[in-house]
């Protein structure tokens, strides 16, 4: 499991297939803590001005921690997946995954003001 603590500008964490052309989904944190399309997921977290966010990324199945706010499939395009801030300027972590579908499950400590995020990205066989 990869774990890191970051200040998240704009209060949005992006999980995206590298090379995606679908664009980043719009998110309104007051309406929903997470939104996604076939190649990208965004998750609302506390803004960097308020405090840091602890992010854990696992490429294996396991138990949830907190509240699950997203559970769907992401199309990986062959170059892996990036977990980053909204534009990728402040932090960016890349994970090798095979081309094809991967399940993505995101759990947070508080859907309204997440300060801990667990992201599970598991390639489907």
Regions found by a protein language model. Name each.
Residues 36-39, 79, 99:
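Short, solvent-exposed coil/turn segments at beta-strand boundaries
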Residues 64-91:
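Extended, solvent-exposed segments with strong compositional bias
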Residues 93-97:
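Short, surface-exposed loop/turn motifs with a glycine/proline- and acidic-biased composition
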Residues 86, 107-109:
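Surface loops and adjacent helix of pleckstrin homology
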Residues 1-67, 112-125:
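Primarily secretory-pathway and cell-envelope proteins
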Residues 98-107:
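A glycine-anchored, Pro-Gly-centered beta-turn/N-cap motif
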């Amino acid at each position: 499991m990869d774990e890191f603590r970051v200040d998240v500008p704009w209060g949005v964490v992006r999980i995206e297939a590298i090379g995606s052309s679908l664009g980043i989904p719009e998110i309104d944190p007051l309406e929903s803590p997470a939104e996604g399309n076939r190649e990208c997921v965004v998750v609302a977290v506390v803004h960097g001005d308020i405090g840091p966010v602890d992010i854990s990324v696992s490429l294996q199945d396991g138990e949830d921690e907190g509240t699950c706010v997203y559970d769907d499939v992401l199309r990986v395009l062959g170059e892996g997946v990036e977990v980053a801030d909204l534009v990728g300027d402040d932090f960016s972590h890349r994970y090798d995954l095979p081309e094809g579908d991967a399940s993505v499950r995101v759990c947070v400590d508080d859907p309204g003001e997440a300060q801990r995020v667990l992201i599970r990205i598991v390639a489907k066989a």
